C-alpha cells in the first residue's frame, strides 16, 4: 500500500539461472523495484503514464552492456501487477493477476498458459506411472510433467509484450492491459490478488478455504484446476500468493 495506490505485485518465477541482484531472485527483485516506484509515484498518473514510467524503472536495472534481455524474454526481470489508483478510481491489470469488484471477478490470464497446463495434466498420470518416485504423500518430489512442458513455457515467453502484457523493462503491450473504471458516486468493495489463488473469493477466509480444498482434492493441479505446476514437497501451496481487500469510499 502507498499513499496514492494499492497494489498486489507478483514477480515471475525465474526460468534462468541469471540473476540481476546479488541476493534476490529476478521475480522478487522486479517486485521490489515496482513497489518502491509506487510509493513515490505521483497520484495523477494515468495507466499509460504508469506503464511508461515503471518500464523505465525496470529497464534501468539491466546492465548497459547486456543485450540478452532484449533477445531472450526468459532473461528478463518480470512481474505482473494489479494496481488501484485511488485518485482516478481505476484498477489496472498488467499481466497474470485477478481482482474482484463488488463480488464480480476479473482476470487477465496469459493466453498461452491454458493449453500448456492442459498438456501437463494429460502427461502427469503417464509420467507418474513411469516414475513411481515422482510423488510422495500427496506431494510432488520431481515434476517430470513440468519438465516436459518447460520448453513450451519458455517458447511462450516470446509473446511477452507482443501478445500479452507484463512489466519487464520493455514497452508494455497496452492491448493486454485491462482497465476497470469504478463508479465515482458509490463505494466499492475491492479484492486485489495474485494468481496464487486458484479460486478467488470476496474474502481472505473464503479464498484460503477454496485453496485448501484444491490442495486436498487435486494437489497436482491436473483435474479441477489445471496449472503448469502443482504442490511440491516441502511447500504449503502451489505458488506465492498475496491478497488485499479494502473498501473504496465514494
Residue ranges and their predicted role:
Residues 1-250:
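PP2C/PPM-type serine/threonine phosphatase catalytic domain
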Amino acid at each position: 500500500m502507498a499513499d496514492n495506490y494499492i497494489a498486489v505485485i507478483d514477480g515471475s518465477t525465474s526460468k534462468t539461472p541469471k540473476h540481476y541482484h546479488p541476493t534476490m531472485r529476478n521475480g522478487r527483485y522486479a517486485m521490489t523495484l515496482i513497489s518502491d516506484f509506487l510509493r513515490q509515484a505521483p497520484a495523477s498518473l494515468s495507466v499509460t503514464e504508469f506503464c511508461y514510467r515503471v518500464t523505465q524503472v525496470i529497464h534501468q536495472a539491466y546492465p548497459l552492456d547486456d543485450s540478452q534481455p532484449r533477445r531472450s524474454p526468459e532473461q528478463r526481470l518480470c512481474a505482473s501487477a494489479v494496481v488501484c489508483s485511488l485518485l482516478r478510481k481505476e484498477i489496472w491489470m498488467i499481466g497474470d493477476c485477478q481482482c474482484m469488484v463488488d463480488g464480480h471477478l476479473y482476470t487477465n490470464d496469459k493466453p498461452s498458459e491454458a493449453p500448456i497446463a492442459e498438456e501437463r495434466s494429460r502427461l502427469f498420470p503417464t509420467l507418474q506411472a513411469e516414475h513411481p518416485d515422482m510423488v510422495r504423500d500427496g506431494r510432488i518430489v520431481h515434476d517430470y510433467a513440468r519438465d516436459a512442458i518447460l520448453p513450451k513455457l519458455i517458447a511462450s515467453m516470446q509473446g511477452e509484450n507482443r501478445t500479452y502484457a507484463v512489466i519487464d523493462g520493455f514497452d508494455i503491450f497496452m492491448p493486454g492491459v485491462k482497465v476497470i473504471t469504478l463508479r465515482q458516486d458509490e463505494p466499492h468493495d475491492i479484492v486485489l490478488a495474485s494468481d496464487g489463488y486458484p479460486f478467488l473469493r470476496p474474502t481472505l477466509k473464503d479464498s484460503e478455504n477454496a485453496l485448501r480444498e484444491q490442495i486436498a482434492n487435486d494437489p497436482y493441479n491436473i483435474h479441477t484446476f489445471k496449472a503448469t505446476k502443482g504442490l511440491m514437497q516441502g511447500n504449503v501451496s502451489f505458488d506465492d500468493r498475496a491478497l488485499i481487500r479494502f473498501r473504496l469510499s465514494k
